[in-house]
Amino acid sequence: MKARKRTNNKWFETQDNISYWEDFNKPKIIWKRIGSILRFSYDDRGCLGLDSTCFAAGEHIEYLCCVLNSLMGHYLLKDSPRTGTGDLLVSVQAIEPARIPYEAKYNDLLSDLLSRQISEGTAATEKEINDIVFVMYGLSPIEREYVTLYVKQSQQSQ
């Protein structure tokens, strides 16, 4: 095996310094790239994902985690590419075009709800998150019902 360029590194060491290596220690969202049901996990302990996962670090990451895990978040990603077996392919490129409004007034509330959901994992907290996200998108009761039924039916068919 021949190196691409001359370095003092051994063959198994990276030859190029990656500029984003510090992001692995920041609060982030980690998710599996391929799957039938979407789950976005919040990490603030510096965990690392496997090679089949993606991660995103940055501002308002708890807020984003709530939106992506909501019924509306799942609905926004419904048109992501799929595998031959129908599983979703949700890479960073699939999430970037999603229109996610940022409303600062919900930032602290969603952060608190995420903490509560992580520690307790209740349906009531999940509903509260979904309701806030529906309000952020300005959905009518009929639109909320449509999104809810669509996501639940698609999850049942998986």
Description of each model-found segment:
Residues Y102-Q158:
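Non-catalytic DNA-recognition/assembly elements of restriction-modification systems
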Residues M1-D108:
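Polybasic, glycine- and aromatic-enriched phosphate-binding surface used to engage nucleic acids
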